[in-house]
Regions:
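Extended non-catalytic interaction/regulatory regions in multidomain proteins
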Residues: 4-19
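Acidic, low-complexity, intrinsically disordered interaction modules
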Residues: 15-77
Length: 85
């Protein structure tokens, strides 16, 4: 059984200790926004990298950026356009 791109991405994040949160998802259009966040250790202190927001349309990652407002605007537009068809 072949894994989808999304499943491979999730497995890769788990393997690299990158946390994933599903922020928004529209079941009808299969478009979702996910936030990933990673951390690292330096001098016995744990630091977190800036979160990265990823827009997935079906099984394809379409957009990846650090600005949630921009990703959310694009997500809203895509969901709206898909439902208008």
């Amino acid at each position: 059984m072949k894994n989808t791109n999304f499943e491979m991405w999730v497995a890769d994040c788990e393997r690299n200790n990158i946390q994933i949160w599903q922020l928004d998802y529209d079941k009808d259009t299969d478009i979702g926004i996910y936030m990933t966040k990673s951390s690292y250790w330096y001098n016995n202190n744990q630091y977190y990298n800036s979160p990265v927001y990823q827009l997935w349309i079906g099984d394809k990652r379409s957009i990846c950026m650090e600005n949630y407002q921009e990703v959310y605007k694009i997500w809203e537009r895509l969901v709206s356009e898909s439902k208008d068809r």
